[in-house]
């Protein structure tokens, strides 16, 4: 089948459909995922085609949803859980941290936990608090979890396939503001490893590293910088835990500068760990300190202040200017 251009949300839908078709043990669970097709219609049509026993509408109880998924995984199923919005995941945090993430190690490797938790996250859609947060660092800190975030339709499709096939739990963060961005998806492609980062734009003067919704912004920054004669490399991290530090290191050894960009607050965000590791690995290559651009260390603001809170072209370009000034 030839490649098809589709929105990121549609790519996830098609990937879930493929998984349901190929493995009767795959189940989808969550609030309004069935009859409604999800708040963002990511699961649209799946309950109609596969039935209520495989695409399951649940009560509004995130802890119960994840706990049920853990039980199903113990019985050999591969549940895919949808948390309706990023800020709704916290009632399930206990189940995720104390049970889901630890079951494999607790059993000395005998018990597998093939559970995927889908979390639409981030801002940019004018929503209120609890609907626009970026809690990925809270999960990346937990050993036993894989944490990923696609930035485009092709990765959304294939990373979902790989997440469902994983015998370890995967937290799959979906960038809401990119749901309707379209790109080519080749259903017959051979994807790289789930954890592998990718250089999506080559450059020589500075590296921008990002994941999920900020990759597109970094590409726009690189376009703007090119108009001033600056050559920026953009690395799509794809995986937040584990991080493909080797790819980032190779880029930084070439460009000698790094700016990490994410929507989550800069304080103790994923960028802090990346900055620390790259400083340790590339100390003698760096021409400037590693800089970070992210949200502020404050509760997510009302929608009318969202644009002031989130990283934008000017804030990232300012970091680029500061780095290149050294």
Spans of model-derived segments:
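Thiamine diphosphate
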Residues: 1-173, 308, ...
């Amino acid at each position: 089948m030839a490649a098809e251009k589709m929105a990121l949300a549609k790519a996830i839908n098609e990937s879930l459909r493929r998984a349901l078709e190929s493995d009767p043990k795959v189940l989808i669970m969550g609030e309004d995922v069935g009859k409604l097709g999800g708040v963002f219609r990511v699961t649209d049509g799946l309950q109609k085609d596969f039935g209520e026993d495989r695409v399951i509408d649940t009560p509004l109880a995130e802890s119960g949803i994840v706990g049920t998924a853990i039980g199903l995984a113990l019985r050999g199923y591969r549940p895919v859980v949808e948390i309706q919005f990023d800020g709704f995941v916290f009632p399930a945090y206990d189940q995720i941290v104390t049970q889901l993430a630890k079951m494999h190690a607790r059993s000395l490797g005998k018990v597998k936990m093939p559970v995927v938790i889908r979390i639409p996250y981030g801002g940019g859609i004018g929503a209120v608090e609890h609907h626009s947060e970026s809690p990925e660092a809270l999960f990346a800190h937990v050993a036993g979890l894989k944490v990923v975030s696609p930035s485009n339709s092709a990765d959304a499709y294939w990373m979902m396939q790989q997440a469902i096939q994983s015998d370890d739990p995967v937290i799959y963060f979906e960038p809401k503001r990119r749901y309707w961005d379209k790109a080519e998806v080749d259903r017959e492609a051979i994807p790289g490893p789930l954890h592998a980062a990718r250089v999506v734009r080559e450059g020589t003067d500075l590296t921008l590293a990002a994941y999920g919704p900020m990759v597109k912004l970094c590409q726009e920054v690189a376009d703007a910088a090119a108009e001033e004669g600056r050559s920026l490399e953009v690395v799509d991290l794809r995986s937040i835990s584990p991080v493909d530090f080797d790819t980032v290191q190779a880029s930084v050894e070439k460009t000698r500068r790094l700016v990490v960009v994410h929507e989550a607050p800069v304080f103790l965000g994923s960028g802090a760990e990346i900055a620390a590791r790259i400083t340790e690995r590339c100390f003698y290559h760096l021409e400037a300190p590693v800089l970070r651009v992210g949200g502020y260390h404050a509760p997510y603001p009302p929608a009318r202040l969202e644009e002031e809170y989130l990283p934008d072209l000017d804030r990232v370009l300012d970091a680029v200017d500061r780095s290149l000034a050294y």
